[in-house]
């Protein structure tokens, strides 16, 4: 019987965080320790690295996720350990898990098996308090908006046009739509508003896109929180809130150093969702790792249609980061599910369903070619995978001109991904990245939306109401037309229908809402039924999480 992830994590032999730091040349005085096994890297030290050459960057992405699981974080960790095993100084850079899905569906997000980040329980829960700081900064701004109106509203804010909600790092559907300031005149002016989850906050996004604290402050100032009665925007700068917000975020902007089970360095920092935000860890963590290592392995959330697309078209576009290679993670089980097999029958050999479902993987491979980046497929191995299924999938991938390598890092750690590591090193040394973004800054916003849908998703285009079209045109006139698009849609399909598996074609994506994130520097396009405040499932993971008789946390996975 296999050990659980948390059992493996609890028996891992951790090294002191100063030892991990020494492996990548960081002296203990440049760390801000949080106990013995985690630390922040000081901003002053990061600044001193500016003249260091950059290492090579590998992005790990995946097919569209299914309940069968793909193992993207596990592969990121296993690949990083494997690269270190073959003598390449490597750092993995990941996002911080959110409490919401931790207690909801996932039960944790630190990798799995013998390819995990530790301390796993701390990482999945409060960690170093970054999310709490972001929540506090976001809600301070919300309080200052209502306070401004209470004390006479000199900015002439229209209470009906306040676009800044409050946030909480929890899945709580009851807070999606609420009325505040009830109870009489001493409590302010009643109005309808709601909560988003913290990882959907624009502050989370802009912190992860900021280059330093000064850049963070400038981005904060640009956030649009409301509109006046004459429909002109009200910003954070108008409320003089950026200083206090930056104070709350001054420690949160510093990346966190932890380790894998094999005692290799990992920077874990920031955590925007990929279905409702841009889905990448912080620019500061990525750039710091590139200055310290030969290779950096990072991931982008959900499938390549969401996380990788935003990594390329938002993160790389804004910061000048250039990836050298991409890994697409797939499992035979998930591809069979894409081919129509019920979740309960995925362990049975089914070549026909695999061939049908592999269309999802093939489309993702072809999409990577649009960005000009070398690509490898990692088949995350399960015991139920038959030899015939493995051969079939490798042949399908070979027809696209790419390789598919079996990876067993979940059960073997880094040595289970050595073949993948060696292939990537060879590929990067042999083939230069010819990276390019999907669309140019100067094309109209509607054209950018349709470009993503037609070129990447395989659809006909977007269904956009006259009201939303008018809003997009207005933003273009106000100077926001050069912003990239951040699509918010279901991660489970190329389409807006989460049940449309495989590689659907000839569909349209309904656009429900658009949001201008002037601080983060992108426009969110909300499609279909996607929610910015999730709810808990029928049987939340929280029901299985508890303390045992030794006060050890159990139930995280």
Swiss-Prot record:
Residues forming coiled coils: none
Disulphide bonds in the chain: none
EC class name: ligase
Catalytic activity: (6S)-5,6,7,8-tetrahydrofolate + formate + ATP = (6R)-10-formyltetrahydrofolate + ADP + phosphate
A Pfam family recorded for this sequence: FTHFS
GO terms, molecular function: ATP binding; formate-tetrahydrofolate ligase activity
Binding-site positions, ATP: 66-73
Origin: domain of life: Bacteria
Keyword set, alphabetical order: ATP-binding, Ligase, Nucleotide-binding, One-carbon metabolism
Gene Ontology terms describing biological process: tetrahydrofolate interconversion
EC number per UniProt: 6.3.4.3
Pathway assigned to this chain's UniProt record: One-carbon metabolism; tetrahydrofolate interconversion
Keyword ATP-binding assigned: yes
InterPro entries in UniProt: Formate_THF_ligase, Formate_THF_ligase_CS, P-loop_NTPase
SUPFAM superfamilies (alphabetical): P-loop containing nucleoside triphosphate hydrolases
Family recorded in the similarity comment: Belongs to the formate--tetrahydrofolate ligase family.
Protein name, UniProt field: Formate--tetrahydrofolate ligase
The organism of origin for this protein: Bartonella tribocorum (strain CIP 105476 / IBS 506)
């Amino acid at each position: 019987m296999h050990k659980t992830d948390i059992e493996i994590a609890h028996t891992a032999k951790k090294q002191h965080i100063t030892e991990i730091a020494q492996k990548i040349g960081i002296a203990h005085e440049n760390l801000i320790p949080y106990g013995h096994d985690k630390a922040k890297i000081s901003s002053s030290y990061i600044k001193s690295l500016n003249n260091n050459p950059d290492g090579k960057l590998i992005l790990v992405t995946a097919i569209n996720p299914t309940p069968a699981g793909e193992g993207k974080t596990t592969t990121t960790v296993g690949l990083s350990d494997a690269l270190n095993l073959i003598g390449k100084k490597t750092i993995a850079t990941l996002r911080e898990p959110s409490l919401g899905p931790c207690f909801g569906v996932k039960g944790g997000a630190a990798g799995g098996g013998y390819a995990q980040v530790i301390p796993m329980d701390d990482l999945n829960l409060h960690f170093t308090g970054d999310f709490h700081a972001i929540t506090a900064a976001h809600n301070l701004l919300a309080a200052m908006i209502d306070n401004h109106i209470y004390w006479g509203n000199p900015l002439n804010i229209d209470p009906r046009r306040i676009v800044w909600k409050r946030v909480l790092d929890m899945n709580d559907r009851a807070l999606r739509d609420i009325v505040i300031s009830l109870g009489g005149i001493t409590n302010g002016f009643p109005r309808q508003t709601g909560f988003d989850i913290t990882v959907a906050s624009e502050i989370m996004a802009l912190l992860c896109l900021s280059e330093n604290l000064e850049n963070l402050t400038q981005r904060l100032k640009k956030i649009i929180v409301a509109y006046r009665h004459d429909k002109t925007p009200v910003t954070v700068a108008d409320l003089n809130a950026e200083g206090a917000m930056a104070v709350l975020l001054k420690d949160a902007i510093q990346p966190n150093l932890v380790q894998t089970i094999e005692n290799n360095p990992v920077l874990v920092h920031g955590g925007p969702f990929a279905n409702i935000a841009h889905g990448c860890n912080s620019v500061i963590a990525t750039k710091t790792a590139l200055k310290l290592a030969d290779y950096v392995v990072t991931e982008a959330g959900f499938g390549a249609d969401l996380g990788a697309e935003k990594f390329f078209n938002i993160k790389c576009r804004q910061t000048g980061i250039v990836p050298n290679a991409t890994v697409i993670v797939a499992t035979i089980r998930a591809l069979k599910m894409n081919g129509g097999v019920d979740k309960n029958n995925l362990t049975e050999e089914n070549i026909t369903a695999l061939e049908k479902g592999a269309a999802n993987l093939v489309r993702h491979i072809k999409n990577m070619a649009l960005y000009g980046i070398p690509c490898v497929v990692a088949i995350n191995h399960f015991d139920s995978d038959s030899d015939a299924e493995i051969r079939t999938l490798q042949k399908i991938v070979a027809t696209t001109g790419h390789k598919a390598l079996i990876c067993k890092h979940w059960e073997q750690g880094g040595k289970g991904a050595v073949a993948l590591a060696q292939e990537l090193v060879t590929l990067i040394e042999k083939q230069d990245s010819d990276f390019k973004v999907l669309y140019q800054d100067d094309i109209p916003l509607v054209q950018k939306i349709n470009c993503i849908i037609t070129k990447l998703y395989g659809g006909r285009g977007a269904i956009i109401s006259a009201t939303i079209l008018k809003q997009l045109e207005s933003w273009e006139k106000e100077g926001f037309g050069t912003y990239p698009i951040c699509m918010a849609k279901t991660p489970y399909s190329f389409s807006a229908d989460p049940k449309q598996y495989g590689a659907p074609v000839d569909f349209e994506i309904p656009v429900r809402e658009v949001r201008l994130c002037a601080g983060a520097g992108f426009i969110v396009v909300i499609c279909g039924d996607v929610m910015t405040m999730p709810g808990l499932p029928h049987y939340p993971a929280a029901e299985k999480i508890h303390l045992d008789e030794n006060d050890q946390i159990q139930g995280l996975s």
